[in-house]
Amino acid sequence: FMLGIPTPEKQMKEAFSEVFGPEQSAQFFDDFVCSFCTEEDFKLLKDTGINLIRVPFNYRLFLDDQNMELRKEEGFRYFDRLLGFCRKYEIYLLPDLHSVPGGQNPDWHSDNQTGTPAFWHYDVFQQQIISLWRDIPARYRDEPYLLGYDLLNEPFLMPAADGKLQQFYERVTACLL
């Protein structure tokens, strides 16, 4: 969504791969992620007196749709790089989980391809994210410049959802403690 193209990220990546090939497409998106927050950005933030940066990320940075038990190292490398800049420039990081399996809202900017927030209909999707939120804090538990976590960006519930958001937050925060 950061490219300003109103298309779910997964569809955009598939289209790039079809046009440019899998290797070139993967390289483009790797380069994009690496250039999204640069050291120059952190220096500018520090020079202007800003001490907190909220960085969105897609669950696919850490999880593979074909094997959700697998943790992709690229997500941890991305956070490691950001936290290195945070320590150097004394800026706090607030990672923002911007998309989850099935989509937490119906919008394209959450990488939702169906327009239905299916995350709330399938416990397996919620379990995958709860598991991810177990792993990320375990790795960064002692990181002084990690301020906290935006556990789920812009959740949207249908009227019949009856407490699902509250239940999810209770389950996910329990694994953080």
Label every PLM stretch briefly.
Residues 1-176:
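Active-site mouth of glycoside hydrolases
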